[in-house]
């Protein structure tokens, strides 16, 4: 029977550790603060941001909320970014994506103070990840790839020398997780597949580990999966459940594929909680660097 990689359980353990560390920082007079910048009133984005602030409350991190109307301009958002860059109460912050189409997302992300980049997506921080194949990285790491690796590590799943097929080349995970998987401490062999990849099913069948992040419901079918493979489902799609009479969230991996897998992450309940836990970890680690108590500082 396949091992279920329970992201909720592992994230809970991580948050318990973070809460202890935050309490230690508080005794030193430092309270980490996470800021969120939300533009518009998209229900999905609002729900996601609300979840982040609940996580903050759970571990003792202060919440700093900034919300702008959907009509906000790039300059309006940049003004908030500059304010958070200068705010000593804000240890790190995120820009909730996607932004409205009329806003220059690259300009916004590029204006973030790299040391306050809680998502680990600033060009400087991504560059540090490219440059440092081995050794400690003292800049924030991308949350979703970091969460995937932490989930696999929690279950003792070895990646060194194994073939990993990454489906999707989005900046959130597809283009960044390969950098983390090929670091000297991990040593996986990575194949990145995308819309231009021919015979994509063959790449999936050869993989020991499949990380699916294409956002297409049921993209990975049971006949595509090598028996015993590890399936990490990152994709998010909303489909109408006729039996329940409402929309529900599903992943990229068809549930029938779980029967042949050696291990799999459920969706929801797998990678999502881990991503949120890593966001908190980035904030706490930056606070520890500021306090001079983190070894990699």
Curated annotation (Swiss-Prot):
InterPro entries: Aminoacid_DH-like_N_sf, NAD(P)-bd_dom_sf, THF_DH/CycHdrlase, THF_DH/CycHdrlase_cat_dom, THF_DH/CycHdrlase_NAD-bd_dom. Coiled coil: none annotated. The keyword NADP applies. Pathway: One-carbon metabolism; tetrahydrofolate interconversion. Transmembrane segments: none annotated. GO terms for molecular function: methenyltetrahydrofolate cyclohydrolase activity; methylenetetrahydrofolate dehydrogenase (NADP+) activity. It comes from the Bacteria. Pfam families: THF_DHG_CYH, THF_DHG_CYH_C. NADP(+) binds at residues 168-170, 195, 236. One of its GO terms (biological process) is methionine biosynthetic process. SUPFAM superfamilies: Aminoacid dehydrogenase-like, N-terminal domain, NAD(P)-binding Rossmann-fold domains. GO terms for cellular component: cytosol. It catalyses: (6R)-5,10-methylene-5,6,7,8-tetrahydrofolate + NADP(+) = (6R)-5,10-methenyltetrahydrofolate + NADPH; (6R)-5,10-methenyltetrahydrofolate + H2O = (6R)-10-formyltetrahydrofolate + H(+). Its EC number is 1.5.1.5, 3.5.4.9. The keyword Hydrolase applies. Keywords: Amino-acid biosynthesis, Histidine biosynthesis, Hydrolase, Methionine biosynthesis, Multifunctional enzyme, NADP, One-carbon metabolism, Oxidoreductase, Purine biosynthesis. Belongs to the tetrahydrofolate dehydrogenase/cyclohydrolase family. Homodimer. Catalyzes the oxidation of 5,10-methylenetetrahydrofolate to 5,10-methenyltetrahydrofolate and then the hydrolysis of 5,10-methenyltetrahydrofolate to 10-formyltetrahydrofolate. This is Bifunctional protein FolD. It comes from Bifidobacterium animalis subsp. lactis (strain AD011).
């Amino acid at each position: 029977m396949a091992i279920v990689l329970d992201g909720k359980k592992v994230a809970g353990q991580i948050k318990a550790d973070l809460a202890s560390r935050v309490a230690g920082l508080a005794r030193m007079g430092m309270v980490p603060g996470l800021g969120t910048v939300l533009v518009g009133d998209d229900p999905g984005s609002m729900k996601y941001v609300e979840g982040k602030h609940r996580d903050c409350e759970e571990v003792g991190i202060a919440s700093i909320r900034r919300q702008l109307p959907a009509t906000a301009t790039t300059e309006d958002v940049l003004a908030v970014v500059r304010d958070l860059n200068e705010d000593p109460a804000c240890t790190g912050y995120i820009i909730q994506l996607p932004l409205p189409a009329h806003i220059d997302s690259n300009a916004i992300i590029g204006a973030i103070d790299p040391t306050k980049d809680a998502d680990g997506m600033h060009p400087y921080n991504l560059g540090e990840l490219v440059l440092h194949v081995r050794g400690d990285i003292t800049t924030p790491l991308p949350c979703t790839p970091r969460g995937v690796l932490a989930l696999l590590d929690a279950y003792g799943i070895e990646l060194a020398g194994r073939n990993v097929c990454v489906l999707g080349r989005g900046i959130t995970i597809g283009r960044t997780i390969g950098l983390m998987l090929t670091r000297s401490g991990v040593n996986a062999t990575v194949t990145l597949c995308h819309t231009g990849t021919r015979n994509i099913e063959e790449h999936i069948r050869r993989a020991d580990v499949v990380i699916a992040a294409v956002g297409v419901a049921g993209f990975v079918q049971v006949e595509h999966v090598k028996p015993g493979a590890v399936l990490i489902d990152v994709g998010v799609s909303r489909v109408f459940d006729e039996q329940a009479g409402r929309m529900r969230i599903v992943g990229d991996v068809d549930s029938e594929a779980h029967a042949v897998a050696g291990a799999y992450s459920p969706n929801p309940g797998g990678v999502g909680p881990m991503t949120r836990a890593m966001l908190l970890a980035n904030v706490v680690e930056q606070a520890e660097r500021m306090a001079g108590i983190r070894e990699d500082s």
